[in-house]
Amino acid sequence: MKHILNLYENINSTARNNSDCPAVILPEEIFFTVSIVGVLENLMVLLAVAKNKSLQSPMYFFICSLAISDMLGSLYKILENVLIMFKNMGYLEPRGSFESTADDVVDSLFILSLLGSICSLSVIAADRYITIFHALQYHRIMTPHRALVILTVLWAGCTGSGITIVTFSHHVPTVIAFTALFPLMLAFILCLYVHMFLLARSHTRRTPSLPKANMRGAVTLTVLLGVFIFCWAPFVLHVLLMTFCPADPYCACYMSLFQVNGVLIMCNAIIDPFIYAFRSPELRVAFKKMVICNCYQ
């Protein structure tokens, strides 16, 4: 993950020397456009929750946490492309102190985005579990203050972990730990899911109205999790292949799709707000009010 400004050249060289697959190069305009749209969409989510007291509940606080993670992923790509552009124009000294510092900052944003997304999805899963199976005690268990404390601890842990990963990113154990977080957290969420839906079936037989009223949030989380896996898994696989088999022709062929995998990550930031709006009538109404007010102003 170090020297991200030189990553494209390394991938091009690897793909050219070890396989018949040329590196897929996408126009920088695509990255800028997708990243800017992702930032604006998730900023709308944050503003909608901030401006509407009806949305200021633990569930939407956790959604805001996921939106912040998506924004960081988009900002990472914007900053990375700007730095690459400056380097190509000769404004950055190759491997100089400023480039090294900028590289660390950009890498930190990227890793923080991934860690924040995984942790936010885990917290949302736990919140949905409490909502469905402890509905009567939910407002006592999950207060807004408690939700904010959870998010503070979550982001403090993600920040510390992100800095540690960037600092020791040239060590293979760090790469293994980084990539292991992805399947471990997903395994936790999936286990919670299996338990959740098995209990939901039994609850449906006894009290049909109770789980049906709250299962919408679980379905929303299912969609969010599916999109997250689809968008991030190709990059995680890329990191593993780049670490353990960079000279293998088949690995090099897959790594030639690095920029495509990068666009997939950016698309995650664009898709998530549409999922929020489609699954949440309250958030959809807040979006409409914001758009109408801005148009009339």
From Swiss-Prot:
Q: Which InterPro entries match?
A: ACTH_rcpt (IPR001168), GPCR_Rhodpsn (IPR000276), GPCR_Rhodpsn_7TM (IPR017452), Melcrt_ACTH_rcpt (IPR001671)
> Which ranges sit in the Extracellular compartment?
1-23, 80-104, 169-180, 245-256
The molecular function terms of the Gene Ontology recorded here are: corticotropin receptor activity; G protein-coupled receptor activity
Hey, what tissues is this thing expressed in? Melanocytes and corticoadrenal tissue.
Coiled coil ranges: none
Q: Which cysteines are joined by disulfide bonds?
A: 21-253, 245-251
Membrane-traversing stretches: 24-49, 59-79, 105-126, 148-168, 181-199, 218-244, 257-278
Q: Does the keyword NADP apply?
A: no
What are the glycosylated positions? 12, 17
What assembly does the database describe for this protein?
Answer: Homodimer. Interacts with corticotropin (ACTH). Interacts with MRAP; this interaction targets MC2R to the plasma membrane. Interacts with MRAP2; competing with MRAP for binding to MC2R and impairing the binding of corticotropin (ACTH).
Stated name of the protein: Adrenocorticotropic hormone receptor
What species is given as this protein's source?
Answer: Bos taurus
Upper classification of the organism: Eukaryota, Metazoa, Chordata, Craniata, Vertebrata
Gene behind this protein? MC2R
